[in-house]
Amino acid sequence: MPKYRSATTTHGRNMAGARALWRATGMTDADFGKPIIAVVNSFTQFVPGHVHLRDLGKLVAEQIEAAGGVAKEFNTIAVDDGIAMGHGGMLYSLPSRELIADSVEYMVNAHCADAMVCISNCDKITPGMLMASLRLNIPVIFVSGGPMEAGKTKLSDQIIKLDLVDAMIQGADPKVSDSQSDQVERSACPTCGSCSGMFTANSMNCLTEALGLSQPGNGSLLATHADRKQLFLNAGKRIVELTKRYYEQDDESALPRNIASKAAFENAMTLDIAMGGSTNTVLHLLAAAQEAEIDFTMSDIDKLSRKVPQLCKVAPSTQKYHMEDVHRAGGVIGILGELDRAGLLNRDVKNVLGLTLPQTLEQYDIVVTQDDAVKNMFRAGPAGIRTTQAFSQDCRWDTLDDDRSNGCIRSLEHAYSKDGGLAVLYGNFAENGCIVKTAGVDDSILKFTGPAKVYESQDDAVEAILGGKVVAGDVVVIRYEGPKGGPGMQEMLYPTSFLKSMGLGKACALITDGRFSGGTSGLSIGHVSPEAASGGSIGLIEDGDLIAIDIPNRGIQLQVSDAELAARREAQEARGDKAWTPKNRERQVSFALRAYASLATSADKGAVRDKSKLGG
C-alpha cells in the first residue's frame, strides 16, 4: 500500500517545524491525515485564455475540502503566443513549456503533494502541465478554462465569423481599408477563453480529453458558459476519490501513466489527425510520451496519418466552424464516436471518471446517448456579449448538430477527406521527418514544386514577403529557427498570414525548422528535422534550388545531387565554430534562452531536453 506523500511533512515529531508552517497556512490537527492536493492554476491578466481563472482555483479547492482533502493552490506562468508573436517575445514561448513542467515538479515535490488538479488552457500551459503530470505520476485531473466565443461582425451586408488570424491577415493586407481592419480587430476576440478555432490551445485541451485525463466536454464547452462550472466542481470532488483509490486501495489504475497509456496516446493522435488539429500537438504529444516513458514516435504518427480520415474541419481550415460549433456537434466525444464506429480506436482505455471508451461513448456521444442532460450540455452556445467573466451566460442552441453527412463532424462515409488533417513527410533534407497540417492545404497545391527563397530568420522572411520579393511559385525556406537554432522554435504565423495578405496563400509554400501557430493554414511545412543548427540538411539549401513537395506520397525533396550536398556540407563544416549558425543575423539571445538551447533536441524528439547531456 503506497504511503501518502504528504505524510513526510505532516507526521512524526521531527516534522514539528513543517507542521508549524502548515498550521500557519490554516491547517489544523484534523487536516494532517488528509491528502494534500495541489491546485495548479495558471491565472494571469496577460492572456485572454487565463484572465478568468483567478476564482476557479478557489472553486476547485472548496470541492476538494468538502470531499475530505486539503487543497493548496499555486500558479504557473503563462505566455500568450499571439501577443508574443512577430517579435523577440516568441523566442520564449516553447521554452516556457519546460519551465512550466519543471515548476510544477518543483512545487509538488518540494511540498510532497499527493495529487493535482491542473487548471490550464493555452498553448504551452496544457502541454507543460501534462508533461509534469506524467513525470510525477500522481493522481491528476485536467480542467481547462475553455474556448473563446467566435467573433462576429458585419462586412458587405453579411454577418461573418472571425478569430485572431483574421485580424492579423486584414491588418497586413494593403487592399483592406483602415476602418475595416479596425472593425475586424475589435470583433475578432470577444470573450475570455482560448482562441476560438482549432488552434494549439483548443487542440491540446481536446487531446487531454482523448487521453482520458479530463472530463467529457472539457475540450469544447465555452469558457463563458454556465455549464462549464460543473466541470470544475466535478474535478474537485473526483480528484479526492482518485487520490484515495491509489493511496488507500493501492489501485494504480488511478495514476496518469495508466490512464494515458500508449493506447490512449494513439487514440489522442487519431483524434488530432481526424480533427485537423494544430501541428504543435505533434511536438507536445511526443514530449509528453517521453515523460510517461512510452515508446511513441514520429513513426507511429506517420502510420496513423496514413489510415485516419479527416472527420472535422474547423477554423483556420474553414471559417464556417469554430469550437462552439464543434461542441454543438458533440465535441471530442462526437468525433471519437465516429472514429470508433470506423474501427480506428483502441477501446481498452479508461478516463478519470473510471469509464471505458465504450461506456463513455454510450453516455456522452450525442448520436447514441439517451441522457437528456448530456444533450442539453452539448447545446451550450455563445451569447455574443463581450466579457472576461467565466460562466457568465447560459445561452443554448435550439438544436444539436447531429448531421454526420453535412454537419461539422462527419461520419467515415462522409469524411471531408480520406486523408487525415495532419501528415508526416520525409525526404533528403527532412530525414527525421517534418509536419504539415493537410487540413489547411488547398487540394490544388498538395503537390508543389518551386525555387527556394532562403531566409535565416523569420524577420527577414517577413520583410521579403511584405516587400514583394516573394512571388507566386516560390518555396520560402526559413531556417535556424528550430529549438536550438532560434533558440526557442518560433511560430511562423506572421509569414504565413502575410503570404495570404499578399495574395500568395495558394501560390507559395513555406518550409521551416521552426513551427507554426495553430492558426496557420496553407502549404506550411514545419518541424523539419534535424534542424539546421543540429547539422540538418535544411542548412544546405541555397536560393534557386528546386524543392518538390508531394503530400499524397508523403515526400519532400531537395532536387540537388548527393555529390553537391556533400560538397556543401564540407564547406559548412569548414566554418569551424561558426558552422551550422546563421551567417548574417543580429539577434540578442539571453542567458536563459542560451541555457535552453544547450540542451534542446530537434522537433522529431518533441524539442525536449537531451537527457544524455546530463548523464540521464
Curated annotation (Swiss-Prot):
Pathway in which this enzyme or protein is active: Amino-acid biosynthesis; L-isoleucine biosynthesis; L-isoleucine from 2-oxobutanoate: step 3/4; Amino-acid biosynthesis; L-valine biosynthesis; L-valine from pyruvate: step 3/4
NCBIfam families in UniProt: ilvD, PRK12448.1
Pfam families: ILV_EDD_C, ILVD_EDD_N
Keywords, in A-Z order: 2Fe-2S, Amino-acid biosynthesis, Branched-chain amino acid biosynthesis, Iron, Iron-sulfur, Lyase, Magnesium, Metal-binding
Purpose of the protein: Functions in the biosynthesis of branched-chain amino acids. Catalyzes the dehydration of (2R,3R)-2,3-dihydroxy-3-methylpentanoate (2,3-dihydroxy-3-methylvalerate) into 2-oxo-3-methylpentanoate (2-oxo-3-methylvalerate) and of (2R)-2,3-dihydroxy-3-methylbutanoate (2,3-dihydroxyisovalerate) into 2-oxo-3-methylbutanoate (2-oxoisovalerate), the penultimate precursor to L-isoleucine and L-valine, respectively.
Active-site feature positions: 517
Name of the protein described by the UniProt record: Dihydroxy-acid dehydratase
Modified residues (N6-carboxylysine): 124
Documented EC number(s): 4.2.1.9
GO biological process: isoleucine biosynthetic process; L-valine biosynthetic process
Keyword Metal-binding recorded: yes
Subunit structure and binding partners: Homodimer.
CC cofactor: [2Fe-2S] cluster; Mg(2+)
Family, as annotated: Belongs to the IlvD/Edd family.
Claim: Metal-binding is one of the keywords in the record: yes
Cofactor binding comment, as recorded: Binds 1 [2Fe-2S] cluster per subunit. This cluster acts as a Lewis acid cofactor.
Catalytic activity: (2R)-2,3-dihydroxy-3-methylbutanoate = 3-methyl-2-oxobutanoate + H2O; (2R,3R)-2,3-dihydroxy-3-methylpentanoate = (S)-3-methyl-2-oxopentanoate + H2O
Species for this entry: Escherichia fergusonii (strain ATCC 35469 / DSM 13698 / CCUG 18766 / IAM 14443 / JCM 21226 / LMG 7866 / NBRC 102419 / NCTC 12128 / CDC 0568-73)
GO molecular function, one term: magnesium ion binding
Source lineage: Bacteria, Pseudomonadati, Pseudomonadota, Gammaproteobacteria, Enterobacterales
Binding site for Mg(2+): 81, 123-124, 491
Matching InterPro entries: Dihydro-acid_dehy_C (IPR042096), DihydroxyA_deHydtase (IPR004404), DiOHA_6PGluconate_deHydtase_CS (IPR020558), ILV_EDD_C (IPR056740), ILV_EDD_N (IPR000581), IlvD/EDD_N (IPR037237)
Residues given in the record as [2Fe-2S] cluster binding sites: 122, 195
